Regions:
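Conserved hydrophobic core element of enzyme catalytic domains
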Residues: 10-129
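Metal-dependent catalytic core segments for phosphate chemistry
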Residues: 1-6
Length: 129
């Protein structure tokens, strides 16, 4: 059930459209199978999903790793809450790693998509500046 749809959330460098979805757990599947069935999220892979993922693999120089993956928690009552790791940085060996992207579609304007990607990364870069 969609409890909230197309809510605009404003952040320091970007805006996001957010929807909240709740549902009943089907005991036919484990909680982990249920969660994994939604990844990678279509909002960051594209459609059709399998071909879009193949193109991403062909074109992107770096693997996504944490970026666009899932972060969340499980409760003892089989509830879970997750999000997609988009505004996330990784600090490893004293280096700060940031990945950002934009939703490329048929009528995308490359300059605008590039600017959007830079704006998304700026919030994290500012945090360590």
């Amino acid at each position: 059930k969609v409890t909230e749809k197309n809510i605009v959330e404003y952040y320091s460098h970007v805006m996001h459209i957010v929807s909240n979805v709740i549902g009943k757990f089907n005991n036919k599947f484990s909680i982990f199978e249920t969660l994994l069935s939604g990844f990678p999220a279509g909002t960051v892979s594209g459609a059709p999903k399998i071909r879009a993922m193949e193109i991403i693999d062909e074109l992107e120089k770096n693997k996504r790793k944490l970026y666009a993956g899932g972060i969340g928690y499980f409760t003892p009552n089989n509830e879970f809450d997750t999000c997609i790791a988009l505004r996330t940085a990784l600090i490893k060996n004293n280096k700060f790693y940031v990945q950002a992207g934009a939703g490329i579609v048929a009528d995308s304007e490359p300059d605008k998509e590039y600017a959007e990607t830079i704006n998304k990364a700026k919030a994290l870069m500012k945090a360590v500046d």
